[in-house]
């Protein structure tokens, strides 16, 4: 179906008192992203010509958090209802475009549902998103005559008979810009709340003989709003289980879908296995046959085929080639790169460092600002001393180097191909190819040594 041009209004002016937070409610996160950002992303994916964000409380925080989005900021200085909020945005509506109204605290609305609503909007009428609830207490009821929508009655204004209606208003609707402006101008606050209800435009449209078409979302969670942290946590689990189901059906083995969090985008190969309590953040790619142990955090990283990440490992902004093994208890920080078959063991940290093919750093090591060649052995307790208190410097280690335990490499320093660094050495000068570097105090031995005795 050919759609008109469309702009989106997102209502985000509420204080969120029940969140008990200094942060505006819509900036609280779901799946690692602000609730309102989910809604903005949906609007952009729909192809909105403009996104008008109606704000009030915490405007500076909102503008800072959403500074990268192309938004038209609309101030609602007083919160006098949804109709009043839309009235503030109305001067920006073009007559020949459709206006879609969304909410910053309803984060899981899907693009698919919104597109169906957009397609269903009748010419000159209103498309309205509704659901049926077993217990509709507190929600505006959809009134009908002969099956046709005639209006919406808020719960506090409804009669006992109207309160028996199970079909309720979600607040999401779409209408033509010129019609919307005309109806908004006719709103009054003659109701129990003393507010201007956007829902009153339904009755106004019906009185003009306009058609109102109701559409239902695919899932109830799409239209659930958030007013407190309990509701947010429940919606988080709903979202996460939905993501887990999609991954399971796509061939990813999640050992317990209830203990998996996706806070971004996961691209994966075949036969991927993910154990419990794993968190995926940002954009992550997992190759074929990747295995991730329990308690790992993977963020903005590429993991190659046949890699195995052992429990409680953190990988951030890193790139792993095929057949690498990591952890347990390892940390790969931004700029870490492992070439094919490399191994990083327990309590090893890497930052802005490359570990070559088949190279190993097995235990208790820090590699920062370093280039390590192929087939290198990094002994336990090795540290690249890359910082002099003011600037960072680089360590370069050639292929086939053996670095003994408890070695300190004071950068800038280069170790040539095939060199050996004796255990306990502090390397302060370059080491040539195939050379042995050793710096130790000569060992002495005192026979019959007695330890000091504590004074009683």
Curated annotation (Swiss-Prot):
Free-text remark on how the cofactor is bound = Binds 1 Mg(2+) ion per subunit.
UniProt key word tRNA-binding? no
**Entry EC number(s):** 2.7.7.23, 2.3.1.157
Region (N-acetyltransferase) residue ranges read 251-456
Residues the entry annotates as binding UDP-N-acetyl-alpha-D-glucosamine: 11-14, 25, 76, 81-82, 103-105, 140, 154, 169, 227, 333, 351, 366, 377
Return one GO MF term: UDP-N-acetylglucosamine diphosphorylase activity
One GO cellular component this record assigns the protein to is: membrane
Q: What NCBIfam families does the annotation carry?
A: glmU, PRK09451.1
Query: Which PANTHER family does the record cross-reference, listed alphabetically?
Result: BIFUNCTIONAL PROTEIN GLMU, NUCLEOTIDYL TRANSFERASE
Its assembly, as annotated, is:
Homotrimer.
Output this protein's name. Bifunctional protein GlmU
């Amino acid at each position: 179906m050919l759609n008109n041009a469309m702009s989106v209004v997102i209502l985000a002016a509420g204080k969120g008192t029940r969140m008990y937070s200094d942060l505006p409610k819509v900036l609280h996160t779901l799946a690692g992203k602000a609730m309102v950002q989910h809604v903005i992303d949906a609007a952009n994916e729909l192809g909105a010509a403009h996104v008008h964000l109606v704000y009030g409380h915490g405007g500076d925080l909102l503008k800072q958090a959403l500074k990268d989005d192309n938004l038209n900021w609309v101030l609602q200085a007083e919160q006098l209802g949804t109709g009043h909020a839309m009235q503030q945005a109305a001067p920006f509506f073009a007559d020949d475009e459709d206006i879609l109204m969304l909410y910053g605290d309803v984060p899981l609305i899907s693009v698919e549902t919104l597109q169906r609503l957009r397609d269903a909007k009748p010419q000159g009428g209103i498309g309205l998103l509704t659901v049926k609830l077993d217990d509709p207490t507190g929600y505006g009821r959809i009134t009908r005559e002969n099956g046709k929508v005639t209006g919406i009655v808020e719960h506090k204004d409804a009669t006992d008979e109207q309160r028996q209606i199970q079909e309720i208003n979600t607040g999401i609707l779409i209408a033509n810009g010129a019609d919307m402006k005309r109806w908004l101008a006719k709103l009054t606050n003659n109701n129990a709340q003393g507010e201007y209800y956007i829902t009153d435009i339904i009755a106004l449209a019906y009185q003009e003989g306009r058609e109102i078409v109701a559409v239902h979302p695919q899932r109830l969670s799409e239209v659930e709003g958030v007013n407190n942290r309990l509701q947010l946590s429940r919606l988080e689990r709903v979202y996460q289980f939905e993501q887990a189901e999609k991954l399971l059906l796509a061939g990813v083995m999640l050992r317990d879908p209830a203990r998996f969090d996706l806070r971004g985008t996961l691209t994966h190969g075949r036969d991927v296995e993910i154990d419990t309590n794993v968190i995926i953040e940002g954009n992550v790619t997992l190759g074929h046959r990747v295995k991730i142990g329990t308690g790992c955090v993977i963020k903005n990283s590429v993991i190659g085929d046949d890699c195995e990440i052992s429990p409680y490992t953190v990988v951030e902004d890193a790139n792993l080639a095929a057949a690498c093994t990591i952890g347990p208890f390892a940390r790969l920080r931004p700029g870490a790169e492992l070439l094919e078959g490399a191994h990083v063991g327990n309590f090893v940290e890497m930052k802005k460092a490359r570990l070559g093919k088949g190279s190993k750093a097995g235990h208790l090591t820090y590699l920062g600002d370093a280039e390590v060649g192929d087939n290198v052995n990094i002994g336990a307790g090795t540290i690249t001393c890359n910082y002099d208190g003011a600037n960072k410097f680089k360590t370069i280690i050639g292929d086939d180097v053996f670095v003994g335990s408890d070695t300190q490499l004071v950068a800038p320093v280069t170790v040539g191909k095939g060199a050996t660094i004796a255990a306990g050495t502090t390397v302060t000068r370059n080491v040539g190819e195939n050379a042995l570097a050793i710096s130790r105090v000569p060992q002495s031995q005192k026979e019959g040594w007695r330890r000091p005795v504590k004074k009683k």
